[in-house]
Amino acid sequence: MAEARDLFKEFKVQSVSEFFRRNAAMLGYTGSIRSLTTVIHEAVTNSLDACEEAGILPYVRVEIEELGKEHYKVIVEDNGPGIPEDYIPHVFGKMLAGTKAHRNIQSRGQQGIGISGAVMFAQITSGKATRVITSTGDDEIVEAWVKIDVQKNEGKIVKKIKHPNPKRWRGTRIELEVKNVKYVRSKQGVYWYLKLTAIANPHAHIELVEPDGKLIVFPRSSEDIPEPPVEMKPHPKGVMTDDVYTMAHRSKRSTVRRFLVSEFSRISDKKVDELVLYIAALRLINREVTDQNLKSQLIERLANGEVEKVLKSFGRKWKKVVEEVEKIMEKPPEKLTWHEAEEIVEAFKLMKFLAPPTYGLRPIGEENIEKGLSSILRPEFVTAVTRPPKVYSGGIPFQVEVGIAYGGEITNSEILRYANRVPLLFDAGSCVITSAVRSIDWRRYRVESFDNAPLVVLVNVVSVHVPYTSTGKQSIASIDEIYNEIRLALMEAARRLAAYLGGKYRRLYQIRRKKIFEKYLPEIARSLHILTGEPEEKIKEYFLRLIESKITVAQEGVSEVEVEEGEA
């Protein structure tokens, strides 16, 4: 039998970078087409986030050069705020690092993996460092070649050059060389990804230079820079014991009371006083009550707000226990124990709080959705709905918005899925957006067959924490609150589509009736001329006036082709 020491000879600590190097598929690097799209996605989302946080209208240029079979150079340049020199190795070479991952704030990226994952993918497929050119608008441009030390999860600058910046250029340009990828104009390729990005970000000017040198421009259709999202404090209903314990031990506040009031939303001094009573009641129930049925009844009464009655049911003991808990609230937060953090969270679950604030959410907006869909897809009809903010899992705010575009240059149906304005191109089958759209009975809204209709449905889920199904961030988990909000938004937009189509069909019917009458009018006039002796022209004029007075047609939105097809 082998000894324990022999078994552990191969024991090794693996860094985050090393883990993802071996499991790149978890980040979306799977398949030649998807891998290239993922590289572009990570770079473009970084650019858009940086521009918006700095209050800059984004200009993003993507160039793809073919170097060989399944071998490309990818260049992404933006006009953002630039990256300070000291942060270059951290931004591009350290996983789980960034300006957003640790904050309760809406953003396109939320894990701190994105662009460093792209750098790592380039490194393990081509062996080349990523070239970064950046300036914050000062008198220097920094050019650096970055690699990742996967064992240490650290960025390493292998070469650096500084250039003068007389024109005060500001922005960032990155160049990655990647292999085992392929550029195609498919629904999962780079072109389609950038097209969908332009729809959801009408304030951005996006350019794509394809491998054959063709330039494609998605011009901005809005000059309004989205307001930067605001960091929001966590809500008591959305935290776990570890959250409270970790936050308390990092807090600079003088007491647990001040920590709770200042670092959580919807908690005031009065609410802390109430929290003390709930913790005291739970302590008494756990200490004094052995009968499980009675224990369940008392906890149910707490959930119904009867905390004072429950406390008094224990006689004089309750005041002493309340004093014990009050002492916890006055001690330094770094001395909060795990058990005390557990008690706080258990009490939170039973207490009633106002819904978390949603001021930090930044939806695209109905007007901008309509602008984006109209400028890129050129439909005959477009509408958008932005639902009021809601919460899921007790305390995480989110918001749903929907756009519908119909007809015009649209030839087939599409579901455009977004999370915080970012297109989701893959794993559609497991996404709550797909299931919500498919659950709608579109025939009720004058769309006989969704799959065959010239109809595009856009759904954007906005949240400080989008519940993705995996680290690849391409599919949103099926959460009831989100599913229901998507359905409500879809039905509201679909009712507007039905009203438009109803009016269109009525106009079409009237035009067809008029054309039928006009078609047979010469024969009717000739016959009446023979019977009455009245001149044919006079009879024609009479009936034309009669037709005009009886059939009023507003032809807006109805093409001649549609009329002719209807007659056939």
UniProtKB/Swiss-Prot annotation:
UniProt similarity note: Belongs to the TOP6B family.
Name of the coding gene: top6B
Record protein name field: Type 2 DNA topoisomerase 6 subunit B
Record field: catalytic activity: ATP-dependent breakage, passage and rejoining of double-stranded DNA
Function: Relaxes both positive and negative superturns and exhibits a strong decatenase activity.
Gene3D superfamilies in alphabetical order: 1.10.8.50, 3.30.230.10, Histidine kinase-like ATPase, C-terminal domain
One of the GO BP terms on file: DNA topological change
Assembly mode: Homodimer. Heterotetramer of two Top6A and two Top6B chains.
Annotated TM spans: none
Taxonomy of the source species: Archaea, Methanobacteriati, Methanobacteriota, Thermococci, Thermococcales
Pfam families, alphabetized: HATPase_c, Topo-VIb_trans
Enzyme Commission number: 5.6.2.2
Gene Ontology MF terms: ATP binding; DNA binding; DNA topoisomerase type II (double strand cut, ATP-hydrolyzing) activity
